[in-house]
Regions:
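Active-site substrate-recognition segment that forms the wall
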Residues: 1-43, 171-179, 187-315
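A conserved short coil-to-beta-strand element within the FAD-binding core of flavoproteins
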Residues: 114-124, 142, 163-180
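C-terminal catalytic lobe of FAD-dependent flavoproteins
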Residues: 112, 239-240, 280-362
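Surface-exposed helix-capping loop/turn segments at secondary-structure junctions
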Residues: 69-81, 159-163, 211, 283-289, ...
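Hydrophobic/aromatic residues within well-ordered alpha-helical segments
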Residues: 56-63, 198, 271, 275, ...
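Alpha-helix/helix-capping structural signal
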Residues: 93, 200-201, 332
Length: 362
């Protein structure tokens, strides 16, 4: 379900004025952000939200199976964990207020089991009594340690004969509209196919190819509570704080918050302070040895749909702009792009992800 739901335009001023709502803006960045923001908010209506949700479902609807298939019989498989996924609400009224989001999830085939009252704490003892309803989705999963997972995937690539080269891309060489080489800080790499898959940093690479994509950095804040006294049994979204709590290899990771402020490396204090307050509210008995803060840059297209496809038969393919779901949708995206590269027509409708869609006025 995308962030741009019905009512966002009307509610945004209230959200920004509320220090307890997990939406922040670096006001000095607003003039640069404004063209993107206007387009972004134009999709905050029922029909577009439903269309976007349907598109995203094709990328993440079977993500657990996709990750398991990708890692089968490899050292990376140990990081893929099966689990339930819960949405935690203060009460039935708070759950009902999210009715449109649940309607979209049900249309996508995700039907929750509802747990209420004291049974909530029996299901998840870490939760305080301020949480009186859990909406539980079964058959989901998570990655126990994303960093180690990706490192192991690189090892698998090498074992299969692939090469991993880290370099800074300077430009692309095209002849007759076809890719012939990628220019980097360590030399020119000749190729007849290339994939742009660099998150928010894909935007300047696309500009080198003559395409200006509406993409902004949505800054997300994470805190890992190391050696926690309690952990949730399954990953859960805390509706009141708009953050996800997951028991991971490093500790209890609480991730969420939205801040628009570009690619500044400086962390803002207010989002982290709010996240700590919300964690304390919902997990009142939690204690921990130490904590680690993390700031990430989510690549956010104006229409919340990733850019997946080929740029005008150039041999250059795109796979970026996954917003909050990059790791989740990675395997399916990779399979789609791999099929396109070898000339197989994907059995998934990829038109919603066309990287040329905004150039054509969509």
């Amino acid at each position: 379900v995308p962030v741009t739901g019905p009512g966002l335009v009307r509610k945004s001023p209230t959200y920004l004025a509320d220090p307890n709502f997990p939406l922040f803006m670096r006001w000095s960045y607003v003039p640069k952000l404004l063209p993107w923001l206007i387009k972004y908010l134009s999709f905050a209506n029922e029909s577009d939200t439903r269309r976007i949700s349907q598109g995203l479902t094709t990328i993440v609807g079977d993500s657990l199976e996709q990750h398991k298939a990708l890692t089968a019989q490899t050292k990376a498989a140990k990081w893929v964990q099966s689990s339930n996924y819960s949405f935690a609400y203060a009460d039935r009224a708070a759950f009902n207020a999210d009715a449109f989001g649940w309607q979209l999830r049900k249309e996508a085939g995700f039907i929750p089991d509802l747990i209420e009252g004291r049974a909530v704490q029996e299901e998840e003892p870490i939760l305080g009594f301020g949480t009186q309803l859990l909406a539980v989705l079964k058959g989901h999963g998570f990655i126990l340690n994303p960093g180690s997972y990706v490192q192991d995937l690189v090892c698998v690539l090498k074992e299969l004969g692939g090469k991993f080269i880290q370099a800074e891309v300077k430009d692309f060489d095209l002849s007759g509209g076809k890719i012939t080489a990628v220019d980097t800080n360590i030399g020119r790499m000749h190729c007849d196919k290339a994939i742009v898959s660099s998150g928010i940093w894909s935007k300047p690479l696309m500009q080198k190819l003559g395409l200006h994509v509406p993409l902004e950095a949505e800054r997300g804040y994470h805190i890992v509570f190391e050696q926690p006294s309690q952990k949730p049994n399954n990953p859960m979204m805390l509706a009141a704080g708009k953050f996800v709590a997951t028991a991971m290899d490093q500790g209890l990771r609480c991730a969420g918050i939205v801040e628009f402020g570009g690619l500044s490396e400086k962390k803002s204090k207010a989002p982290l302070q709010l996240l700590r307050r919300k964690v304390q509210e919902v997990f009142p008995k939690l204690s921990f040895a130490s904590e680690q803060e993390w700031l990430a840059y989510r690549p956010a297209p104006t229409d919340s749909l990733p850019y997946i496809g080929e740029l005008s038969a150039s041999g250059v393919f795109t796979a970026f702009g996954h917003h909050h779901i990059g790791l989740t949708g990675g395997p399916k995206t990779g399979r789609l792009v791999a099929d396109m590269i070898v000339g197989h027509h994907p059995n998934t409708d990829i038109r919603p992800f066309d990287p040329m869609r905004f150039k054509r006025g969509k």
